Regions:
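Cleavable N-terminal export/targeting peptides
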Residues: 1-48
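N-terminal entry module detector
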Residues: 29-117
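Short loop/turn motifs that connect adjacent beta-strands in outer-membrane beta-barrel proteins
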Residues: 35-48, 95-102, 155-165, 219-231, ...
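Transmembrane beta-barrel strands of outer-membrane/channel proteins
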Residues: 51-59, 105-111, 155, 167-175, ...
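Extracellular/periplasm-exposed beta-strand and loop segments of Gram-negative cell-envelope proteins
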Residues: 60-87, 109-148, 174-208, 238-271, ...
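Residues on the lipid-exposed face of transmembrane beta-strands in outer-membrane beta-barrel proteins
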Residues: 90-96, 149-157, 169-173, 211-217, ...
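A structural/positional concept
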Residues: 144-152, 162-166
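Long, positively charged binding patches that form subdomain-scale interaction surfaces
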Residues: 210-243
Length: 332
């Protein structure tokens, strides 16, 4: 069901291209469909509300963590793990708009699980050569569940300076649950071994509150595209404090070996959106979004079977996230 919805949303986004590329008779039919949809939207919903529905694709994105050796020679890092994020997400945005402010809420969930990029695990465990990577492994990786939430307040003061430059603030929550599987490992001597089956269960959450600015402008395109009479452009930049929590269960290690990281730091975020008006209450949206999260803090290692439980500082958690989103917006 979810996959079918995703296909429908993608098809809706492609319609905008078709309106430009198709012959006049096909464009006329497309306009009739838009008119009917616009009439339906006008008869439902509540005043001051907008709803977007779309798909998001992550590109060249990952989330990583590393920790040092707490004992001499204190190599840093001792171990580093990098998990890819390149899945498709389905979601939407609910907006409530007043004259001087608006409240926006986004929610997204992953559509597919398997990543096309390999997870990487590296170790520097030779005490005589602390800067020499000694073990490297790659594994297939699936995202069992991924959730993204964003609650944003946009202020629209009537002062002249804020007519196009709007203050924003909000809260974000991200949750990722990965499982690595069917990997291979190679040592410094060139000897390699296969790692069949599941290898690591890794759960991660990010929380960040942020403040920033948003710039909006409008462009009249009625003389170019009949079905796209105008376009809105929006660019937002924000900065916030972030916290991260990790839990890593190594399934191939003896006992029940779990590492935890509790870290804090910051997040930079930038987004650019183009909105294509098809009718007064129907828009197509295309946006690009980038986040960089960097946090530092404590690392804990436990293994209940061997009665191991100790903690130390120096862990680092970071994530680069680039995504492209296509959506349809209905204005009530």
């Amino acid at each position: 069901m979810v996959c079918r919805i995703g296909v429908v949303v993608l098809a809706t986004a492609l319609i905008y291209l078709c309106s430009v590329l198709l012959p006049p008779t096909a464009v006329a039919t497309f306009d009739e469909v838009l008119d009917t949809t616009s009439d339906l939207v006008s008869g439902v919903g509540a005043k001051n509300w907008q709803y977007d529905m779309g798909i998001k694709k992550f590109v060249n994105s990952y989330t990583s963590y590393q920790f040092p050796n707490p004992f001499p020679p204190n190599q840093d890092p001792l171990s580093r793990l990098e998990f890819p994020i390149d899945q498709w997400f389905l979601g939407g945005e609910y907006d409530y708009i007043e004259r001087n402010w608006s409240l926006e809420f986004q929610s997204w969930m992953n559509l597919n699980e398997e990543s096309r990029t390999m997870m990487q695990d590296s170790d520097w465990d030779n005490e005589n050569q602390p800067f020499q990577k000694t073990v490297f492994s790659e594994s297939k990786c699936r995202l069992n569940s991924g959730w993204l939430f964003d609650l944003k307040l946009v202020l629209k003061p009537e002062w002249s300076i804020f007519r196009t430059l709007l203050p924003i603030g909000g809260l974000r929550y991200q949750s990722f649950s990965f499982t690595t599987h069917d990997g291979s490992q190679v040592g410094l001597d060139g000897h390699s071994i296969d790692l069949p089956g599941d290898g690591i269960n890794f759960d991660q959450t990010f929380y960040h509150g942020y403040l920033g600015m948003e710039v909006n402008t409008k462009l009249n395109t009625s003389g170019v595209f009949r079905s796209v009479p105008s376009m809105d452009f929006k660019v937002s930049v924000d900065y916030g404090l972030a916290t991260a929590r990790n839990e890593d269960l190594h399934l191939l290690r003896s006992g029940r070996r779990i590492t935890n990281e509790n870290t804090s730091g910051h997040c930079w975020h930038a987004e650019a959106t183009a909105s294509f008006y098809a009718r007064r209450n129907i828009k197509g949206l295309l946006s690009a979004d980038f986040k960089r999260i960097i946090t530092d803090g404590g690392h804990q290692l436990t293994n209940s079977v061997f009665n191991i439980d100790f903690s130390f500082d120096g862990a680092r958690v970071w994530s680069d996230q680039l995504s492209i989103t296509a959506a349809t917006e209905f204005i009530f």
